[in-house]
Amino acid sequence: MKIVDTHCHTGIHKYEPVESLLYHMDTCDVNQAVLIQHAGETDNAYHVQCMERFPGRFAAAMIVAPEDDGRQIRCWAERGVVGIRLPANSRAQCADPLAQWRTAAELNLIVSAPCTPSALLGEAFTEVINLFPDLHICIEHLGGVGLEPQAPYEAFRAVLALAERENLSIKLPGFGEFCPLPYPFSDVAPLADMAIEAFRPNRVMWGSDYPPVSSREGYAHSLEFPMQYFSKLSEEDRAWIFGRSAQTVWQLT
């Protein structure tokens, strides 16, 4: 089974250089990864360099300035960046508030969307998914659910209803994002199970959240625990969750 990590941060001004990520990937037999630009950084050149230095191992999602009307998006796309990070309620600070969403749709980019449940259920995101039904949007961090939800998980269930939109997928993070430490987790809410039931395995993709995951369960455990937790699933379903979904969406071969 090929394993793809769909949520990694790396850089030279914040976090760690790519060699640190590659060490963890190689140690854990992770084949490929998606470099998600970190908040506040609009120079995506380092990610382009990473893709050029290690061909076939990485895809990347850019961030552009709030006032960009699409021109910078086009420039980075021409350099091989296949995705863009746009918060679910994002609006550009230019003549066309939807310019960045519109450009992403025109270029067939993948949107990696940081979010909260309220943002996903709000009017701004609803407008986007209605206007751009063919734009693939990958919901980050299990919908931003965090450690807060309590049964019966009404807000999270409302988020999962978005699975009826075929252009949406969802990232499954390390369980330390929604399970109390320490590791191994003993109190596991059924959120991951619910997400897989709603989106089906072919629209769920694992992402470690490296390097912030290092302050939770750590990189290796962020993969080890869900792999063990979902051992009851078929080999095909697990292949989708831990690699094939990401390869399909992020154009990794």
Residue locations for each model-derived region?
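Conserved protein kinase catalytic core
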Residues: 11-13, 146-147, 177, 215
